[in-house]
Amino acid sequence: MSEFVTVARPYAKAAFDFAVEHQSLDRWQDMLAFAADVTRNEQISELLAGAVAPETLSRTFIAVCGEQLDEHGQNFIRVMAENGRLLVLPAVLQQFIELRALLESTVEVEVLSASALNDKQLANIAAAMEKRLSRKVKLNCKIDKSVLAGVIIRAGDMVIDGSVRGRLERLTDVLQS
């Protein structure tokens, strides 16, 4: 997967720069998301992995995407097909989203909790994370019963484990050492 990220980076950067220049970030993100979903289709991924001529591949892929791709999006798909890189479209999308977050000075923060959090709790978490990261945050809340109670917060490579499960694991480690 890390090789996909490396391969995807220049494509994501090119798409991102074009989208910024033409003030079409939303449109490009939507096109990339749709194209990435198409690559996840079992029949399409088999076609992409097979020995198919790039022209045929790009024509087929663009036909499947239909009107979801504008002219520039179709050209982008053609270039990726010519270079045999359509399978990395999900990684291109992820890189594009990360570049957009940097531009907009936001960071996506994942919040795992055992049950749904109320608006006040979410506001407190958002405020604390914005202060700590010095950036705007976008909370992505998920419910995970294995947390037991408390929350686990992830932002990039930073993890704050305030869960009962985490405390029990740390206590177990201390008792076993």
Swiss-Prot record:
Alphabetical list of InterPro entries matching this protein: ATP_synth_OSCP/delta_N_sf, ATPase_OSCP/d_CS, ATPase_OSCP/dsu
Coiled coil: none
Keyword terms of this UniProt record: ATP synthesis, Cell inner membrane, Cell membrane, CF(1), Hydrogen ion transport, Ion transport, Membrane, Transport
Membrane topology category: Peripheral membrane protein
Entry's Gene Ontology molecular function annotations: proton-transporting ATP synthase activity, rotational mechanism
Predominant location: membrane
GO CC annotations on file: plasma membrane; proton-transporting ATP synthase complex
A Pfam family recorded for this sequence: OSCP
Subcellular location: Cell inner membrane
Protein's job: F(1)F(0) ATP synthase produces ATP from ADP in the presence of a proton or sodium gradient. F-type ATPases consist of two structural domains, F(1) containing the extramembraneous catalytic core and F(0) containing the membrane proton channel, linked together by a central stalk and a peripheral stalk. During catalysis, ATP synthesis in the catalytic domain of F(1) is coupled via a rotary mechanism of the central stalk subunits to proton translocation. This protein is part of the stalk that links CF(0) to CF(1). It either transmits conformational changes from CF(0) to CF(1) or is implicated in proton conduction.
Subunit structure: F-type ATPases have 2 components, F(1) - the catalytic core - and F(0) - the membrane proton channel. F(1) has five subunits: alpha(3), beta(3), gamma(1), delta(1), epsilon(1). F(0) has three main subunits: a(1), b(2) and c(10-14). The alpha and beta chains form an alternating ring which encloses part of the gamma chain. F(1) is attached to F(0) by a central stalk formed by the gamma and epsilon chains, while a peripheral stalk is formed by the delta and b chains.
Family assignment from sequence similarity: Belongs to the ATPase delta chain family.
Protein name, per record: ATP synthase subunit delta
